[in-house]
A protein has these predicted regions:
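OB-fold and OB-like single-stranded nucleic-acid-recognition modules
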Residues: 1-245
């Protein structure tokens, strides 16, 4: 039970489209590869290579295109990060224009969400209040399962972490945050925004269904009310008419 996913805005360059054919397969598949960088709040940028499936008649993006990316990730020690993208949404505009950068979202540091195990106890960082612990996670990247080590940080300057317990050794956690930098050992650091401790197995449950609201806009700021009622009954007192907010 393990995973690593990254999402955020990335600059893409040196795109190339590559064909591959698995042993025994009768057809070729195509992927686009891009050079990119994973920017950290400390000012460090980790070099990365992004791969995404390329459909028929697809073309590569222009150099310096900024796109919103959702990808699985692998962090080999002291090597380029490998990103396996499932979604790439290029932002509108001309990347060669001087005005292109002015219209981009001010969100340069990608977010990470993962599930992994904690192999050792936490350590207190040099500020005397922040705590750090390593997490080991695996993900299917570049046609194989690959394992990565990350260091998660409880930022001591944020009061919300003052009473949060650190994970137990060998426990499984879910973590969410943004990239802060790299340790001296070359392990990426993640400043946590959220953590779930002692993640365990739960039996699957059936999700409740509800009518789909009418779509009016591509992005909605307000949700349309949803009405749910039971079928007609001879007894009026048994009718239910509820409004969910």
């Amino acid at each position: 039970m393990s995973s690593i996913s990254i999402f955020g805005f990335f600059g893409l360059a040196t795109g190339r489209r590559v064909a591959s054919q698995k042993p025994g397969a009768s057809t070729k598949s195509y992927h686009c590869f891009y050079t990119t960088a994973l920017q950290c709040s400390s000012g460090v940028a980790l070099p990365a290579e992004l791969r995404v499936y390329s459909p028929f008649n697809d073309s590569v993006l222009a150099d310096n295109t900024v796109a919103f990316v959702v990808a699985k990730a692998h962090f080999p020690r002291n090597e380029s990060v490998l990103l396996e993208a499932s979604h790439i949404v290029p932002l509108p505009g001309d990347p060669s224009s001087d005005e292109y950068d002015n219209n981009l979202p001010d969100s340069p540091y990608p977010f990470i969400i993962g599930l992994g195990s904690v192999p050792s106890r936490f350590e207190t960082l040099s500020d005397g209040v922040s705590k750090a612990f390593n997490v080991v996670s695996s993900e299917f990247v570049r046609d194989g399962l690959k394992t990565s080590s990350l260091q998660c940080i409880f930022d001591g300057s944020r009061p919300r972490w003052s009473r949060t317990p650190t994970p137990n050794v060998n426990s499984t956690i879910q973590y969410f945050g943004s990239f802060a930098g790299v340790t001296q050992d070359g392990i990426p650091r993640v400043t946590l925004d959220s953590i779930i401790l002692n993640v365990g197995h739960n039996e699957p449950s059936t999700a409740a269904t509800a009518p789909t609201p009418i779509k009016k806009w591509k992005f909605a700021a307000f949700a349309a009310p949803m009405y749910v009622h039971v079928p007609f009954s001879p007894d009026p007192s048994s009718l239910i008419y509820s409004q969910r907010w």
